Amino acid sequence: MDPCECSKSGNCNCGGSCTCTNCSCKSCKKSCCPCCPSGCTKCASGCVCKGKTCDTSCCQ
């Protein structure tokens, strides 16, 4: 099962392998968040967080 915890307060933590701040997502996936956190460039394909920070690599 997905070890993800997500809160509307904007804090996502996926099994300790990913941390998203100000994500404001309503659901979590193993890719951390189905949405683009603030500071992360939005892309048509959507965003995923890799590592502990969100940068250009968050877009797949």
Swiss-Prot record:
This is Metallothionein A. It comes from Parachaenichthys charcoti. The lineage of its organism: Eukaryota, Metazoa, Chordata, Craniata, Vertebrata. The gene is mta. The keyword Transport does not apply. SUPFAM superfamilies: Metallothionein. A divalent metal cation 3 binds at C14, C18, C23, C28. Residues 29-60 are annotated as: Alpha. Belongs to the metallothionein superfamily. Type 1 family. A divalent metal cation 1 binds at C4, C6, C20, C23.
